[in-house]
Amino acid sequence: MVEQNPAAVIEWVDIVDEQNNVIAQSSRQQMRAQRLRHRATYIVVHDGMGKILVQRRTESKDFHPGKLDATAGGVVQSGENYLESARREAEEELGIAGVPFAEHGQFYFEEECCRVWGALFSCVSHGPFALQPEEIDEVCWMVPEEITARCDEFTPDSLKALSLWLTRNNEQDYGKITPREA
C-alpha cells in the first residue's frame, strides 16, 4: 500500500517473523533503517535461450545503488501477495505485462543490511523494455557464465535468487553463484 500526502509518499510494507508470518506494518524507510525482516519478489527475466536480462540499478536506490541486478522485482507492499507484487514490479520496472510467470518457491536471505523472505519467479520476454528511470539505468543480456565472472558487481540477493532458479532448472554448472570473498 502506498499512502500519499502533499509532503511525501509513504510506502507501507509488511514485516514478517522467522517463519514468514506477517507481524506488523512499517514504512519502507523505517524497514530499511531498522533492518526489519520483510518480503520481496525476484523475477528472472530470460529469453528462453539461455540469456538473463540484467539491470543496472540507479545511484538513487536505497539498497545497493549502482549495482547490477540479476533479477527484476522489489519489496512487497503491505497487503499485497507475492505474485501481485511480481507482476506490478515487472510492469513498473521493465514494462513487462501480459506474460505468464512461473513460480519457483520461496527462500530466506540475510546480509548486513537486509533480512528478506523472497519469492522466486521467472518469465520469458524479448522486449522491447520500458525502463523505469528512477529504478534502472540500463539493461543488457548476459549468459550465466558472464554473471559468474562479474558476480562482485551484482546485488547478493539477486545472485542467490538466480542461483536457486538455475539449480531448480537443472543448470547445475551455475547452481552456486555467490559473490567472491574479499
Swiss-Prot record:
A motif (Nudix box) lies at residues 73-95. InterPro entries: NUDIX_hydrolase-like_dom_sf (IPR015797), NUDIX_hydrolase_dom (IPR000086), NUDIX_hydrolase_YfcD_pred (IPR024195). GO terms for molecular function: hydrolase activity, acting on acid anhydrides, in phosphorus-containing anhydrides; metal ion binding. Mg(2+) binds at E89, E93. Its EC number is 3.6.-.-. Residues 36-164 form the Nudix hydrolase domain. It is an enzyme of class 3 (hydrolase). Keywords: Hydrolase, Magnesium, Metal-binding. Gene3D superfamilies: Nucleoside Triphosphate Pyrophosphohydrolase. The keyword Glycosyltransferase does not apply. The keyword Cell wall biogenesis/degradation does not apply. Its cofactor is Mg(2+). GO terms for cellular component: cytoplasm. Belongs to the Nudix hydrolase family. This is Uncharacterized Nudix hydrolase YPO2781/y1614/YP_2383.
